[in-house]
Curated annotation (Swiss-Prot):
InterPro entries: NXP1_M-like (IPR049589), Rad21/Rec8-like (IPR039781), Rad21/Rec8_C_eu (IPR006909), Rad21_Rec8_N (IPR006910), ScpA-like_C (IPR023093), WH_DNA-bd_sf (IPR036390)
GO molecular function, one term: chromatin binding
S-S bridge residues: none
Post-translation changes: Cleaved by separase/ESPL1 at the onset of anaphase; this cleavage is required for sister chromatid separation and cytokinesis. Cleaved by caspases at the beginning of apoptosis. Phosphorylated; becomes hyperphosphorylated in M phase of cell cycle. The large dissociation of cohesin from chromosome arms during prophase may be partly due to phosphorylation by PLK1/PLX1.
Biased composition (Acidic residues): 531-549
Organism: Xenopus laevis
Comment block on domains: The C-terminal part associates with the head of smc1a, while the N-terminal part binds to the head of smc3.
Protein name, entry field: Double-strand-break repair protein rad21 homolog
Subunit relationships: Component of the cohesin complex, which consists of an SMC1 and SMC3 heterodimer core and 2 non-Smc subunits RAD21 and STAG1/SA1, STAG2/SA2 or STAG3/SA3.
Length: 629
C-alpha cells in the first residue's frame, strides 16, 4: 500500500490535498479557500502515521495544485478590481466642466432658520368666527326631507293622539271603508270613482264616534255583507268594495286609465282633491289595501305566462369498461420472428457511380433509352424525332427469313447470343464497379472479346456488313441496322476498337488462377449460401445464439479453405500459396473471408504466414498441424 486510510477519509486533514492531487475537477472554489496549506504541509512533514514516499509525493502535488488555484483566484480578483478602478476613474468620464464638478455650499447645506416661538397669539375678537361659521351653516328646509304623504280619506280622525295604533283599536274604529266593504253587493260592482269618493267623504264627515261602534258589524250577523245571502241587492257601494266572483253577471271595467297605471301601493289613492277632512295614512293600511285589490287590476298585473317546469335531462355517465388483452405474453417464436425480420430498417444500397461517364452509362444503358436515343445527346427535339423514326429492328426479320431458308444450325446460337448480349457482362456487377474501379479495363477486354466473337460469327454466317456495324452493336447492342447518323458518332464513342485485336491473345497467356483449379477455394458459392442460410435459420430456432452460429459458419469456411489448400498443394506440388493469387477475380467480401480463414488456420498452426514488407503479398506455407487439424 502506498497510502494510509486516514488520507482518503473525507474528514481527514489531508482529504482536500489528496483530492486535488488525483481529482482536481472535484474541488470547488470554496474548498480551495478553506484549505490551510501551512497546516497541511506540516501534517505532511510530520505525519501521525508513517507514509510512503510515493504518498507524500502525491500530497505535495495536491499542495502545489491548491496553491496554484489560490494564486489563480487571487490574480483574477486583482484583475477584476483593477479593471473596475480603472473604469471608475478613467479621464473624460465626467461630462461636467471643471468649475461645476464641485457642488456649491448652499446647494448641499440646509439654511439655519430659527423661528420666534414666543410671539403672542392674536385675540379672538380679531377673527370673525361667526362669519366663518355662518358660511358652513344651512337652512333647515335645505337639509330636511319633506314628508310627502298622500291624503287617504278612509279614517275620519285627524288627531294622531285620538287614533289608536294598536290593531285592536284599529278594528274597533269602524269607518266608512269597513262599512262599505262588508255591506257591498254584487249589483254595485260597477266602478264610479267620483261618486263613491264624494259619498265616502260625506260619510266620513258626518259619522260620529258612537256610530262607528254602532255600525262596525262586530258580533251582529244579521246586517248583511259579502257573506250574507243579500249579495244581489242594489245598495250603493264604494270604489273599494270587494266584489265576489259572480259568473252570472260580467264585471264592468273602469274607463279611466288612472287606476290601471297605479301600483298596488297606490290603489288607495283615488285622485280626489285634498280636503282638510282627509285622514293621514296609517302603518297597517297596506295590508287592507292588498285585501281590497280590484279584480281588473289583478288580471292585468298578475296574469303571467305559465312557467314551463321541465327538468333538464343530464346524460348518464358511461362506465368505462376495462379491456384486457386475451394474450398477455408473446411466445418465443413470435419474438424471434420479429427480431429476425429487419426488412423495414434495411434498404438496398444505391450508390452513384464514381465517374460521370459511368453515371451517364447507367442512365442511358437501359433498353428504353437505347431504343430511343442516339449514341450522343441530341438537344434538339426535332432531330431526336427524326432519329427515333428510323429505329426499326430489320435485322432480326432478315435473320428469321434466312433461318427459313436453311441456315438454322448456326443461326439459333447467334440469335440466342444476339437476344441476350448482356450475359458476358453479368460477372461485372454495379457494386463491383463501385468497389473496384480498377477493373474497368478488364470490362473493356471482355467487351472486345465479345465483339471479336460476334464479328467472326457475322463473317461466317452473314454477308460482309458495312464497317459501321461493329460500332453500332457496341453502342446499342440490340440494333445491328446501320444508321447514317451513327457514322458521324463513330469516332466519338468507339475509341478503343483499333488496338483491341492484339489483346485478344492475352487471355491464353494469363496463368490460370488457383481458385479455378480448386473449386473448394471459392468459399460458400451462391447456391450453397442459400442452403447454409436456411440451415442456420433452422438451427437458430432450435439451439444456440448468434455468436455460436457465427463461429460454426467460420469453422465451416476454414475447413473448406484447409481442404482446398491441401488439394492445391497435392495437385501443383508447390510449397507455398499466395493470398494475392487466391483472391484474384473475387470481390472484397470473398477476399476478406479468405484472409480471415488464413488467420484462423494460422492460429490453429495449420499454416504459416509470411510477409516481406507491409502491404505486400502474404505467402502461406504448410504448418505443423496442416494434415492433422
Amino acid at each position: 500500500m502506498f497510502y494510509a486510510h486516514f488520507v482518503l477519509s473525507k474528514r481527514g486533514p489531508l482529504a482536500k490535498i489528496w483530492l486535488a492531487a488525483h481529482w482536481d475537477k472535484k474541488l470547488t472554489k470554496a474548498h480551495v479557500f478553506e484549505c490551510n496549506l501551512e497546516s497541511s504541509v506540516e501534517s505532511i512533514i510530520c505525519p501521525k502515521v508513517k507514509m510512503a514516499l510515493r504518498t507524500s509525493g502525491h500530497l505535495l502535488l495536491g499542495v502545489v495544485r491548491i496553491y496554484h488555484r489560490k494564486a489563480k483566484y487571487l490574480l483574477a480578483d486583482c484583475n477584476e478590481a483593477f479593471i473596475k478602478i480603472k473604469m471608475a476613474f478613467r479621464p473624460g468620464v465626467v461630462d461636467l466642466p471643471e468649475e461645476n464638478r464641485e457642488a456649491a455650499y448652499n446647494a448641499i447645506t440646509l439654511p439655519e432658520e430659527f423661528h420666534d416661538f414666543d410671539q403672542p397669539l392674536p385675540d379672538l375678537d380679531d377673527i370673525d368666527v361667526a362669519q366663518q361659521f355662518s358660511l358652513n351653516q344651512s337652512r333647515v328646509e335645505e337639509i330636511t326631507m319633506r314628508e310627502e304623504v298622500s291624503n287617504i280619506n278612509i279614517l275620519q280622525d285627524n288627531d294622531f293622539g285620538d287614533f289608536g295604533m294598536d290593531d285592536r283599536e284599529m278594528m274597533r274604529e269602524g269607518s266608512a271603508f269597513e262599512d262599505d266593504m262588508l255591506t257591498t253587493n254584487a249589483s254595485n260592482l260597477k266602478l264610479e270613482p267620483e261618486q263613491s269618493t264624494s259619498q265616502l267623504n260625506e260619510k266620513s264627515n258626518h259619522l260620529e264616534y258612537d256610530d262607528q261602534y254602532k255600525d262596525d258589524n262586530f258580533g251582529e250577523g244579521n246586517e248583511g255583507g259579502i257573506l250574507d245571502d243579500k249579495l244581489l241587492s242594489n245598495d250603493a257601494g264604494g270604489i273599494f268594495d270587494d266584489p265576489p266572483a259572480m259568473p252570472e253577471e260580467g264585471v264592468a271595467m273602469p274607463e279611466q286609465p288612472v287606476h290601471d297605471d297605479l301600483d298596488d301601493d297606490d290603489n288607495v289613492s283615488m285622485g280626489a282633491p285634498d280636503s282638510p277632512d282627509s285622514v293621514d295614512p296609517v302603518e297597517p293600511l297596506p295590508t287592507m289595501t292588498d285585501q281590497t285589490t280590484l279584480v281588473p287590476n289583478e288580471e292585468e298585473a298578475f296574469a303571467l305566462e305559465p312557467i314551463d317546469i321541465t327538468v333538464k335531462e343530464t346524460k348518464a355517465k358511461r362506465k368505462r369498461k376495462l379491456i384486457v388483452d386475451s394474450v398477455k405474453e408473446l411466445d418465443s417464436k413470435t419474438i424471434r420472428a420479429q427480431l429476425s425480420d429487419y426488412s423495414d430498417i434495411v434498404t438496398t444500397l444505391d450508390l452513384a457511380p464514381p465517374t460521370k461517364k459511368l453515371m451517364m452509362w447507367k442512365e442511358t444503358g437501359g433498353v428504353e433509352k437505347l431504343f430511343s436515343l442516339p449514341a450522343q445527346p441530341l438537344w434538339n427535339t426535332r432531330l431526336l424525332k427524326l432519329f427515333t423514326r428510323c429505329l426499326t429492328p430489320l435485322v432480326l426479320d432478315d435473320l428469321r427469313k434466312r433461318r427459313k431458308g436453311g441456315e438454322a444450325d448456326n443461326l439459333d446460337e447467334f440469335l440466342k447470343e444476339f437476344e441476350n448480349p448482356e450475359v458476358p457482362r453479368e460477372e461485372l456487377r454495379p457494386q463491383d464497379v463501385i468497389d473496384q474501379p480498377i477493373l474497368e479495363e478488364a470490362s473493356h477486354l471482355q467487351e472486345s472479346l465479345m465483339e471479336g466473337s460476334r464479328t467472326h460469327l457475322d463473317d461466317t454466317i452473314m454477308p460482309p456488313p458495312p464497317p459501321k456495324q461493329g460500332v453500332k452493336r457496341d453502342s446499342l447492342q440490340m440494333e445491328p441496322e446501320p444508321m447514317p447518323m451513327m457514322q458521324e458518332a463513330e469516332p466519338q464513342i468507339e475509341m478503343p476498337p483499333p488496338p483491341l485485336p492484339p489483346p485478344l491473345e492475352l487471355p491464353p497467356e494469363e496463368p490460370q488462377s488457383i481458385s479455378d483449379l480448386i473449386p473448394e477455394l471459392n468459399l460458400l458459392p451462391e447456391k450453397e449460401k442459400e442452403k447454409d442460410e436456411e440451415e442456420e435459420e433452422e438451427e437458430e430456432d432450435t439451439t444456440g445464439t448468434e455468436q455460436d452460429q457465427e463461429e460454426r459458419r467460420w469453422n465451416k469456411r476454414t475447413q473448406q479453405m484447409l481442404h482446398g489448400l491441401q488439394r492445391v498443394l497435392a495437385k501443383t506440388g508447390a510449397e507455398s500459396i499466395s493470398l494475392l493469387d487466391l483472391c484474384r477475380n473475387t470481390n472484397r467480401k470473398q477476399a476478406a473471408a479468405k484472409f480471415y480463414s488464413f488467420l484462423v488456420l494460422k492460429k490453429q498452426q495449420a499454416i504459416e504466414l509470411t510477409q516481406r514488407e507491409p502491404y505486400s503479398d502474404i505467402v502461406a506455407t504448410p504448418g505443423p498441424r496442416f494434415h492433422t487439424v
